Curated annotation (Swiss-Prot):
Cofactor: pyridoxal 5'-phosphate
Key words, A-Z: Amino-acid biosynthesis, Aromatic amino acid biosynthesis, Lyase, Pyridoxal phosphate, Tryptophan biosynthesis
EC number: 4.2.1.20
Entry function: The beta subunit is responsible for the synthesis of L-tryptophan from indole and L-serine.
Origin species: Mycobacterium leprae (strain TN)
Self-association and partners: Tetramer of two alpha and two beta chains.
Protein's UniProt name: Tryptophan synthase beta chain
Catalytic activity: (1S,2R)-1-C-(indol-3-yl)glycerol 3-phosphate + L-serine = D-glyceraldehyde 3-phosphate + L-tryptophan + H2O
HAMAP family: Trp_synth_beta
Amino acid sequence: MMPNLSCFSVAISEPTCHDPDSGGHFGGPDGYGGRYVPEALMAVIEEVTAAYEKERVNQDFLDLLDKLQANYAGRPSPLYEATRLSEYAGSVRIFLKREDLNHTGSHKINNVLGQTLLAQRMGKTRVIAETGAGQHGVATATACALFGLDCVIYMGALDTARQALNVARMRLLGAEVVSVETGSRTLKDAINDAFRDWVTNADNTYYCFGTASGPHPFPTMVRDLQRVIGLETRRQIQYQAGRLPDAVTACIGGGSNAIGIFHAFLDDPGVRLVGFEAAGDGVETGRHAATLTGGLPGAFQGTFSYLLQDEDGQTIESHSIAAGLDYPGVGPEHAWLRETGRAEYQPITDSEAIEAFRLLCRTEGILPALESAHAVAGALKLASEIGKGAVIVVNLSGRGDKDIEAAAKWFGLLGTR
């Protein structure tokens, strides 16, 4: 019988050799990360940093988080061997880390439970968050309902239209959903408005950042809260396959689910770490969200990392069929891993992702999020590259209920026959 694999408090409390410096830079003072925010936010961010450093080693805080993750969120999540998908890929073993089975349907709950509990410990009564696909918004609204906190979710107007089901879920959970009409009306614009709210209402408000980006300490804090994915996976794959995998894959927008599963394998050079970005209509078309493939270093929304920008340094609008990947930036630790060569980042187009979405439905009876489908598509490419006998882990970061309408339209399934 498999042993209890709970390792959530370990993920948060134990520092690693891959942590940033005191200023939040990965790769030294001139590296990626840091704090690029207005002076009005510096004191607030310092308050969050101090609170997190205190609570991450507070046993009462850790014990409560462990209980919530086990009894409320449903951890550990299973590692499932997808035998029919593996047969399709050709004599490989593909394992799915089932973050889609967590409460609220994605990996987002791992981060949100920790941050909302931190907000409560800090005496905040109001929590704000940004969301793209709606999964982080749903998770935040859920946790705020659990802790009795007011909740406001900022979401681009384009995303509220294509993720209407999650908008309804957030409102049912008691959250106010603010539709952002400025800019490209997607995730980056939702983040901008959330920052404006935070500056104005810092006394009673906590900003629950959803991805491993933004100003320090958010990239590190979100990573720590998501590290449980990789720590569980490492134990599970050795138990089920008898060895470490040849490759670990994940989709990547801002990068929280990817850094969460990658981190436990950083010191294993025999394990390839591959993040699959949203190539949209193709990187060559300019309509994509493949930041590490087609972007350049620069400061964006509080951090120094890669972003999609023109020759004048202005941010370029991103595009992806997956709202959660439709973002022109990426977390600074991923930029550092790319620079060092420890992780690889490859583009997957909309059409490749949605074909993988359908394939997983029909081979395994699993409906993945369109974001996660990018990782499935990428794993199939890796399978042919690595060859027979390969063991590949895919982080299935979320479920696809929210994407049924988009997929049905793509495949022409909504008409009568």
